[in-house]
């Protein structure tokens, strides 16, 4: 199981890559074209605190990737004990949580290397879509960038 501090470190690392790709939106798993390739020409040779844009305490843990549109980072997280899902939007410059929606769920057996938050959201200029499932349901929820639920 991934620890909260490890989750924060991984999140900060991914965010650095997303921030460095500046003009390129990171809209889905493996980026804009699904190939895991960024327009970033080089990465830091050594990792240090000066390369981190922000650190933010997040609820739960997750194995999904954050996505980026403009100045907003969207991600899915979940409580490893209760399976409660956390749909989050953060300011890409400060790490401040701009909005959050929490959804109760039921626990169930997971793959050894999975979590209750394994699906990466997708985002475009108008909406962000999150998905997750439990043994009885599959949930797909769309939100505006301001956090208003558009459909489920």
Regions found by a protein language model. Name each.
Residues 21-152:
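Noncatalytic, solvent-exposed loop/strand surfaces
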Residues 1-11:
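Bacterial N-terminal signal peptides that target proteins for export
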Residues 9-19:
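Bacterial N-terminal signal peptides
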């Amino acid at each position: 199981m991934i620890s909260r501090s490890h989750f924060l470190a991984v999140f900060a690392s991914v965010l650095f890559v997303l921030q460095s790709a500046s003009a390129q939106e990171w809209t889905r798993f493996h980026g804009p074209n699904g190939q895991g390739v960024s327009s970033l020409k080089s990465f830091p040779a050594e990792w240090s605190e000066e390369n981190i844009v922000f650190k933010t305490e997040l609820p739960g843990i997750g194995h999904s990737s954050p996505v980026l549109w403009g100045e907003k980072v969207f991600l899915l997280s979940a409580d490893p004990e209760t399976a409660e899902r956390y749909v989050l939007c953060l300011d890409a410059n400060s790490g401040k949580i701009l909005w959050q929606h929490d959804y109760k769920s039921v626990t169930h057996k997971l793959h050894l290397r999975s979590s209750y938050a394994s699906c990466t959201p997708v985002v475009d200029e108008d909406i962000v879509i999150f998905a997750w499932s439990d043994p009885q349901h599959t949930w797909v929820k769309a939100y505006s960038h301001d956090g208003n639920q558009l459909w489920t």
